Structures are given as structure tokens and as C-alpha cells.
Amino acid sequence: ITCAADENDGGNYQLNGESFETTSDQDLYFGTKLAINDADQTDIIIGLAVTDTTLLGGLADGIYFESVDGAATISTVTEASSSETQNDSAGTFVDDTEIELEFYYDGTAGNVEFYIDGSLVNTHTTTIPATQMRVSIHFLTGEAVANTCTIDWIRCIQIGR
């Protein structure tokens, strides 16, 4: 994804169809490998969310990773009915360096485990959305420069028992 060279230019992308949900009889996995060229001058949300045309403007339901302009820190977020649990400083983006971001919803335990580069960084037990969601990405530049987010892969798997 390459932004135009104006502050807050970028894109809001969502996979067609709300195909993934958190239910007690299923497990859910989301993962991606990406790199950002200027980590502290961009905004990103990546994960699962309900249909929304401005994810960074405040979405109602989702499970995602977030980083905002002015910092390269990564937050883990679960959000249900516009109420969120957010853990800041779960990790840090480094310019032009690939990073793996993954989360796993355990339907039996009812929690979401967040991983960065294979290491568990947070577990959320509250504000887990109970609605169907879609793979979602919102990426913006935070300066008058055409910044990029290079996504190597994204995968999302829901497994019933």
C-alpha cells in the first residue's frame, strides 16, 4: 500500500463479506507479516472489524493491532459495541523491518491471545466482539510523504469443533 504524499492520505480496505466471528464452539486465528517504511509517521489498524468506512476514525467492533502517527508502538485492541480494551506498547515497528502480528481467539476460554513475532504479548478477556467481522486494514501517512506498508501475507482461519 503506497499513500499519496499528503498527510492523512491512505486507504481503508476490507475483505468482502463479514465471514469471521467469535463463538464458544469455534476457534479463530488471524495473522499477517508486514513492513512499514516510516513507522512513526504512519497510522495503521490491521485485523478483524465490522464493516466500516473509516476504521481509524473509531470502529464499533473488532480485534486488531493499531499504531498511530507520532509513535512506532503497537497496541493490541479488542472492541465490542464501541467499548474497547487496549494494551499500549505491546511491541514496536522498526522502519523497513518485517514483523509478524497474530492473534488467536480460544472459543472455549473466551479470550484473545495476541502475538508479535511468535511471542505472546497480551491476553484480552473482555470487550470481545460477538458479531461477524471481516479482514480489515486502514493505513495512512502522517506527513506529506508517500509512505508504504508492504504486506507479505495475511491469513485468517476459523475452526469449528
Model-based region annotation:
Residues 77-100:
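Short, aromatic/His-centered strand-loop micro-motif at the edge of beta-sheets
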Residues 1-73:
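Secretory/extracellular carbohydrate-interaction modules
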Residues 90, 116-134:
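Short, solvent-exposed beta-strand-to-loop segments that form ligand-recognition rims
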Residues 42-44, 63, 110-112, 147-149:
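Short beta-strand/loop motifs in extracellular/secreted proteins, especially
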Residues 30-32, 96-107, 112-114:
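Short tryptophan-centered beta-strand motifs in secreted/extracellular beta-sheet-rich domains
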Residues 23-25, 94-96, 128-130, 144:
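Surface-exposed coil/turn segments at beta-strand junctions on protein surfaces, enriched
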